[in-house]
């Protein structure tokens, strides 16, 4: 994912109203180019006989006057009529059609630096400061005063579509029986008093942040949060943990929501949740373990229903978690916006809080504020049954996730840049080497690439398991051949160049995944039967991303994490820093073939070997400082 920077000083900073940016439309790649690239991406990942069969299928699909050309013409017509020809297809395919539960399977989390709260008041001061930052940031959005993002990295200096920012606080993912709906509040007039929903002890409270046309100060917010904590502690008033329902599979939650909506009180309460700015989850202590790994798990799934897993409402785009034990961060419903937008927003909030925290926030007592309101949710016997089922399934998610935060500190992006390499490409090749070492094969790999250079652009896929990467990893693991280091280095450079070329293809709208997706979806309307092209095992395999990766760089102390996207897969989110690289590695215990600790150790070993390979041709003064023979893996106290 390309790194973002604010507009360079030499360029005028424009308001970020996405309607005002004169961005080009996403281009439609040439059909034959996409088909050739598809075959090139898959040839080395499937058996030879299977590839020959797929090659013939692709040839028939792309033949002159054939189905491929017909679909391509339809797609070009769609490009003319829409702002972005793939956005609807992509949103449905990536998110809204997915029936899996949101925690771990879909919703990523950003984990802040651990906080050291002395008491509950410290926790609430932090939460009040965070809410104040949210309101300040929302003011920038409402006034279209947010500076435009500009691309950095490959093809830097281009303005990026800002539309996603306007969904941060105005979106809600409504569960459906077969497909979810992404709802956006579009009203330009001021709605009812703006409010945040505060979750505390699995109860939900309405915190009005504007009262009598005045935005509440941090002191006011602190006062109101103290009232909420007191109200939540009243066990006589406690309601069932309805938030658990949002952690269930999407179809199951849609069914449970239909039951809830039969009651008018529930309808009003759900409406307040669905229209809120964001959630703030005041969590109780977790397991007592406060490593990066355990804090990340608290954000990803809350530790299940016995800890903080019910203190959530997963449909809301942003849930800010402020834990009594100092575990803080944000859980993101991913469908409205991409990770880099979340990081930009979060870094803005943390900078606001660093400035604000220089003064001690005390409760304001100038005027008596109306008490926050507890949301009433009536629970029928049928809903009780849904809750029991949801709790059991969330517990299965918690037990099944195999997750580790691994900080590789032998070197970071400073050393990689000294080699004249892209840190992202270097790390991607290291991930391929790690996977090959463990499994003696490469697999379809997903790396998100921003296409925000275009109107309403989201992402496409960099397929980093290239033939060139395979040649390199085979050379690095074939100890019998004894290939000279100089030849291995040349293979590394070739693999890096292949990754760079595919990255440029992706960010300029020329990659294959979105294109093939659109052709497949157009075929649904045009063909009575699914075309053999999209039923072929090679195509189906190409969309099972056993390795799901993303670079999410930050300038502040925080990191992003998510779960695998297939049952036998690994998630690998990484954050390159000058002298270290933080990896969040995920897999499922239910797959006996995978192990997150083993994969993290293999990544560390691969990065060390690649450093040593680079150092073999360097003059002494440019070698990395204090070479280390081995990367200590998670089992050697490297787990964060």
Curated annotation (Swiss-Prot):
Which residues participate directly in catalysis? 334
- GO molecular-function terms, A-Z: choline binding; choline O-acetyltransferase activity
User: Which Enzyme Commission number(s) are on file for it?
Assistant: 2.3.1.6
Residues recorded as binding CoA, renumbered to this chain, are: 412-424, 450, 551
Sorted alphabetically, which keywords does the UniProt record give? Acyltransferase, Neurotransmitter biosynthesis, Phosphoprotein, Transferase
Please provide the Gene Ontology terms (biological process) for this protein: acetylcholine biosynthetic process; adult walking behavior; antral ovarian follicle growth; chemical synaptic transmission; dendrite development; establishment of synaptic specificity at neuromuscular junction; memory; muscle organ development
Pfam families for this protein: Carn_acyltransf
Disordered: where is this region? 614-640
- Purpose of the protein: Catalyzes the reversible synthesis of acetylcholine (ACh) from acetyl CoA and choline at cholinergic synapses.
Recorded protein name is Choline O-acetyltransferase
Q: Which organism is it from?
A: Rattus norvegicus
């Amino acid at each position: 994912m390309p790194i973002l920077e604010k507009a360079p000083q030499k360029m005028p900073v424009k308001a970020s109203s996405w309607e005002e940016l004169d961005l080009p439309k996403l281009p439609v790649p040439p059909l034959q180019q996409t088909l050739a690239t598809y075959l090139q991406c898959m040839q080395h990942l499937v058996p030879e006989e299977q590839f020959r069969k797929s090659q013939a299928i692709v040839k028939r699909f792309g033949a002159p006057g054939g189905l491929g050309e017909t679909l391509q013409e339809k797609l070009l017509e769609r490009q003319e009529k829409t702002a972005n020809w793939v956005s609807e297809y992509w949103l449905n395919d990536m998110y809204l059609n997915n029936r899996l539960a949101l925690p771990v399977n879909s919703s990523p989390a950003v984990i802040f630096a651990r906080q050291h709260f002395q008491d509950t008041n410290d926790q609430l001061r932090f939460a009040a400061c965070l809410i104040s930052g949210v309101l300040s940031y929302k003011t920038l959005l409402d006034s279209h005063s947010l500076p435009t993002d500009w691309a950095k990295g490959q093809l830097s200096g281009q303005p990026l579509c800002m539309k996603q920012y306007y969904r941060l606080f105005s979106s809600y993912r409504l569960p459906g029986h077969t497909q979810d709906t992404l709802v956006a509040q579009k009203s330009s007039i001021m709605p009812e008093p703006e409010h945040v929903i505060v979750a505390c002890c699995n109860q939900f409270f309405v915190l009005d942040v504007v009262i009598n046309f005045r935005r509440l100060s941090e002191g006011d917010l602190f006062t109101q949060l103290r009232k909420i904590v007191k109200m939540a502690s009243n066990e006589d008033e406690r309601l069932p943990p309805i938030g658990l329902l949002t952690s269930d599979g999407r179809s199951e939650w849609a069914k449970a929501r239909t039951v809830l909506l039969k009651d008018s009180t529930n309808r009003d309460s759900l409406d307040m949740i669905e229209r809120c700015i964001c959630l703030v989850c005041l969590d109780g202590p977790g397991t007592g373990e406060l490593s990066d790994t355990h804090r990340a798990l608290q954000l990803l799934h809350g530790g299940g229903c016995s800890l903080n897993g019910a203190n959530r409402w997963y449909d809301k785009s942003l849930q800010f978690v402020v834990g009594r034990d100092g575990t803080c961060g944000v859980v993101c419903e991913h469908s409205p916006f991409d990770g880099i937008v979340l990081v930009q927003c979060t870094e803005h909030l943390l900078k606001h809080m660093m400035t604000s925290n220089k003064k001690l926030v005390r409760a304001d007592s100038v005027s008596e504020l109306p008490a926050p309101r507890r949301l009433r949710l009536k629970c029928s016997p049928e809903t009780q049954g849904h809750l029991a089922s949801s709790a059991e399934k969330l517990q299965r998610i918690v037990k099944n996730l195999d997750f580790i935060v691994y900080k590789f500190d032998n070197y970071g992006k400073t050393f990689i840049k000294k080699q004249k390499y892209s840190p992202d490409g270097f790390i991607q090749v290291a991930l391929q080497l790690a996977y090959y070492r463990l499994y003696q094969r490469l697999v379809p790999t997903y790396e998100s690439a921003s296409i925000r250079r275009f109107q309403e652009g989201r992402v496409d896929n960099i397929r980093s398991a290239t033939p060139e990467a395979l040649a390199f990893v085979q050379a690095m693991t074939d100890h019998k051949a004894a290939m000279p280091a100089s030849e291995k280095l040349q293979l590394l450079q070739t693999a890096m160049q292949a990754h760079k070329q595919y990255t440029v293809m992706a960010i300029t709208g020329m990659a294959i995944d979105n294109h093939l997706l659109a052709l497949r979806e157009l075929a649904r309307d045009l063909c009575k039967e699914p075309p053999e092209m999209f039923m072929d095992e090679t195509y189906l395999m190409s969309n099972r991303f056993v390795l799901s990766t993303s670079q999410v760089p930050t300038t502040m102390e925080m990191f992003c994490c998510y779960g695998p996207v297939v049952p036998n897969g690994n998630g690998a989110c990484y954050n390159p820093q000058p002298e270290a690289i933080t990896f969040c590695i995920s897999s499922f215990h239910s797959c006996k073939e995978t192990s997150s600790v083993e994969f993290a150790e293999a990544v560390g070993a691969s990065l060390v070997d690649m450093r040593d390979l680079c150092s073999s041709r360097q003059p002494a003064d440019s070698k990395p400082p204090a070479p280390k023979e081995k990367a200590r893996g998670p089992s050697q106290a490297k787990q964060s």
